[in-house]
Amino acid sequence: MSLNIFWFLPTHGDGKYLGTSEGARAVDHGYLQQIAQAADRLGFGGVLIPTGRSCEDSWLVAASLIPVTQHLKFLVALRPGIISPTVAARQAATLDRLSNGRALFNLVTGGDPDELAGDGLHLNHQERYEASVEFTRIWRKVLEGENVDYQGKHIQVKGAKLLYPPIQQPRPPLYFGGSSEAAQDLAAEQVELYLTWGEPPAAVAEKIAQVREKAAAQGREVRFGIRLHVIVRETNDEAWAAADRLISHLDDDTIARAQASLARFDSVGQQRMAALHGGNRDNLEVSPNLWAGVGLVRGGAGTALVGDGPTVAARVKEYADLGIDTFIFSGYPHLEESYRVAELLFPHLDVQRPEQPQTGGYVSPFGEMVANDILPKSVSQS
């Protein structure tokens, strides 16, 4: 099975280490453009753009990077309850047209009650999922060209319609991640691809089975994806040393404050991430080559696959064997790590790459010339 491999745009900050300004770098438009263009050239299928008050706006970032990329798809956030589903459908269709069919959408219900209240959304966990179901039903139908009247508990529209359709038909795909029962019910009814954060394979297999069963009961099939960090190096020892360096500036107080902040979240997925490490920096390898160190101070995806190319590829294939076809990766710093993943991991996987222009041989430098006169020795990439 060919795998879809996505990268990540760190619009909430980037650097060499977690939890410190040491080795940090400014994430301005020029830097985001560097990462997007690297991902585009290296053969990543798309990039996930995060959302929330700690991030730049994902829609504006995507729109700004469309003109400077050729093949890359942009996975941007839909925020039920924050915006009208009809307006969101018009925005989605516009972004899809502007990008010539390179727009993908990620339904994000939110998990931080404090942040949501600041955005004007005062619904509890169950109510947010009720509103998300209503939002998504309307959004899908409007994008598919229907005239929509809908009277829901949280959302009511009359005569909602779209005059200018998207490029992708019947509409761009919808991605979504959530671990609660309500989230799985929404996924089974509404989305094309269900995402999970990087839990151990047995836990992921259980979630996939649950969503697959719920979708089948509605006569639907759902694809599956996973969100993970990657620390890949030429040897396993080098990879584990890099993992240790990533958290080498973290002190116990920073970890405790981060975990206290994340504890207020009502996201089941966030609670499951926190349970993997318990706020303790010891015994962070929670499954073979699955390291929970990132989650000590980062909300959301908190685990990384660690190892050399063949080792990480073997773990990726374990998840693929469960039915996962889409992997959304990231690494610190994101520019350099995009190259490491492409160079050290891609050769060991069947990666579904966007079409690239064919050069017909060496028409530009590919490895530094030897003695200014001799082409570098060719090495198989398989």
From Swiss-Prot:
UniProt entry tagged with the keyword Signal: no
Top-level class of the enzyme under EC nomenclature: oxidoreductase
- Name one process (GO BP) from the record: alkanesulfonate catabolic process
Q: Write out the entry's keywords from A to Z.
A: Flavoprotein, FMN, Monooxygenase, Oxidoreductase
GO MF annotations in UniProt? alkanesulfonate monooxygenase activity
Q: Catalytic activity, per the record?
A: an alkanesulfonate + FMNH2 + O2 = an aldehyde + FMN + sulfite + H2O + 2 H(+)
| EC code | 1.14.14.5
Note the coiled coil stretches, chain numbering.
none
Q: Which Pfam families match?
A: Bac_luciferase (PF00296)
Which range is the signal sequence, renumbered to this chain?
none
Q: Which InterPro entries match?
A: Alkanesulphonate_mOase_FMN-dep, Luciferase-like_dom, Luciferase-like_sf, SsuD_RutA_monooxygenase
* Domain of life assignment: Bacteria
Instruction: Tell me, in a sentence or two, what this protein's role is.
Output: Catalyzes the desulfonation of aliphatic sulfonates.
The cross-references to HAMAP family, in alphabetical order and at most eight, read: Alkanesulf_monooxygen
Q: Which family does it belong to?
A: Belongs to the SsuD family.
Q: What is this protein called?
A: Alkanesulfonate monooxygenase
Organism for this UniProt entry: Pseudomonas putida (strain W619)
Gene behind this protein? ssuD
